Swiss-Prot record:
Cellular location(s): Cytoplasm
Keyword terms: Antibiotic resistance, Cytoplasm, Methyltransferase, RNA-binding, rRNA processing, S-adenosyl-L-methionine, Transferase
Binding positions (S-adenosyl-L-methionine): 18, 20, 45, 66, 91, 113
SUPFAM superfamilies attached to this UniProt entry: S-adenosyl-L-methionine-dependent methyltransferases
Protein known as: Ribosomal RNA small subunit methyltransferase A
Annotated family: Belongs to the class I-like SAM-binding methyltransferase superfamily. rRNA adenine N(6)-methyltransferase family. RsmA subfamily.
Miscellaneous comment in the UniProt entry for this protein: When overexpressed partially suppresses the slow growth and decreased 70S ribosome phenotype of an rsgA knockout; RsgA may be involved in 30S ribosomal subunit biogenesis. Upon overexpression also restores cold-sensitive growth of a missense mutation in Era.
Phenotype upon loss of function: Inactivation leads to kasugamycin resistance. Cells lacking this gene show cold-sensitivity phenotype, altered ribosome profiles, and small subunit rRNA-processing defects.
Native source organism of the sequence: Escherichia coli (strain K12)
Disulfide bonds: none
NCBIfam families: ksgA
GO biological process: maturation of SSU-rRNA; response to antibiotic; ribosomal small subunit assembly; rRNA base methylation; rRNA methylation; rRNA processing
Gene name of the encoded protein: rsmA
One Pfam entry name: RrnaAD
Major location category of this protein: cytoplasm
């Protein structure tokens, strides 16, 4: 028996497809999302509608973004969901969530069982639309959720942690075993809730600068920041900000990265590209 086939659909490796089939897990996720009529609910990668059906039952209208042509067509003819659905057969990685929020007249509530092969770049794409998003609930590789929630001085703490926590309050919701999927992935999964900050706890003048600093620091995470960020900050400047130049990237808090970004934005602003 081919364990890549579920409900007559062959899971495509290039789309990173693993279909959720555990009813207890599905019910737990839907309860965590708590969808309400009148809200702008948007699902990324509905697949075989494991979450789409129970969420759709509670709603009059649901928007879905599905790259797989066969799955999008299958949803169009769904017996009870079809009339409720607005289907975008598009790549979520290039989708304009800001335009959709404007069209729907309210911030979006985004959810989905994300393909693990694109989950990290997709998170960064979504962060650029946090002013158009009310909240997000995603099933992700457990290791990615650990990185999203990690604090300084831990192995999991990295650029994703800093940028996620700059934009959002990140809350782990539920751990999910491989047996909850067809085909079962080789890794554990987890559900995470991300709520964009209503008021930024650490406002940054130019987020591109924060992105640059975190990229350079974590690309050389074994080096002290005196070395990894030496082209951007002198030892005197770091010390003046109360940041020890002997620290490594993983020792620096989100607040400190934002402080560094604001210093650089004021003293060496990036040119408009």
């Amino acid at each position: 028996m081919n364990n890549r086939v579920h409900q007559g659909h062959l899971a495509r490796k290039r789309f990173g497809q693993n279909f959720l089939n555990d009813q207890f897990v599905i019910d737990s996720i839907v309860s965590a999302i708590n969808p309400q009529k009148g809200q702008a609910m948007v699902e990324i990668g509905p697949g075989l509608a494991a979450l789409t059906e129970p969420v759709g039952e509670r709603l009059d209208q649901l928007t879905v973004i599905e790259l797989d042509r066969d799955l999008a067509a299958r949803l169009q003819t769904h017996p009870f969901l079809g009339p409720k659905l607005t289907i975008y057969q598009q790549d979520a990685m290039t989708f304009n969530f800001g335009e959709l929020a404007e069209k729907m007249g309210q911030p979006l509530r985004v959810f989905g069982n994300l393909p693990y092969n694109i989950s990290t770049p997709l998170m960064f794409h979504l962060f650029s639309y946090t002013d158009a998003i009310a909240d997000m609930h995603f099933m992700l590789q457990k290791e990615v959720v650990n990185r999203l929630v990690a604090g300084p001085n831990s192995k999991a703490y990295g650029r994703l942690s800093v940028m996620a926590q700059y934009y959002c309050n990140v809350i782990p919701v539920l751990e999910v075993p491989p047996s909850a999927f067809t085909p079962p992935p080789k890794v554990d999964s987890a559900v995470v809730r991300l709520v964009p900050h209503a008021t930024m706890p650490h406002p940054v003048k130019d987020v591109r600068v924060l992105s640059r600093i975190t990229t350079e620091a974590f690309n050389q995470r074994r080096k002290t920041i005196r070395n990894s960020l030496g082209n951007l900050f002198s030892v005197e400047v770091l010390t003046g900000m109360g940041i020890d130049p002997a620290m490594r990237a993983e020792n620096i808090s989100v607040a400190q990265y934002c402080q560094m970004a604001n210093y650089l934005a004021e003293n060496a602003p990036l040119q408009e590209s």
